[in-house]
Amino acid sequence: MTRGLRNNNPLNIRRNNTKWQGLAKEQTDKAFFVFVAPEWGYRAALRTLQNYHRVHGLMSIRQWIERWAPPVENPTDSYLKFVCEKVGMPADACPRISNKTIMCNIVAAMSHFENGVPAVMADVHKGWELL
C-alpha cells in the first residue's frame, strides 16, 4: 500500500499549519498529513484546488498541476498529461470549481497518478459532499 493510501491522504498533501477537518489525532507521518478516512483526504485536495482558483487566481488544469507537483520534485509534465488524458480535457482548460463531476474526476486522476491505482470514486464523491 502506498504512503498516500496508508495515510488516507491520496494526493499526498504535505504537512503545514492548515487545520484540516478529518485529521487523525496522531500525525504519525512527519512529512504528510494523516486523515481518519480517505474521504477527508479527498476533501482537503478538492478544497485546495478550489483555493488555487479562488485565492491564487489559478484557473487551468495546467496551473493547478504545476503548483501541486512542481518540477523541482515531480515529473510535472507526465503528471499533467496523465490527468488530462484521464479526464478528457486539455491542459489549458479552466474547469468550473463548482462542477462536482469534473472536480471529482480531476482529483481521482491525480490520486491515480500519485498512488499508481485508480481512486475509489465513492470516497472521492464523499469528499465532495464534505465540502
Model-derived segments and spans:
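Cell-wall polysaccharide-cleaving catalytic domain and substrate-binding groove, primarily
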Residues: 1-131
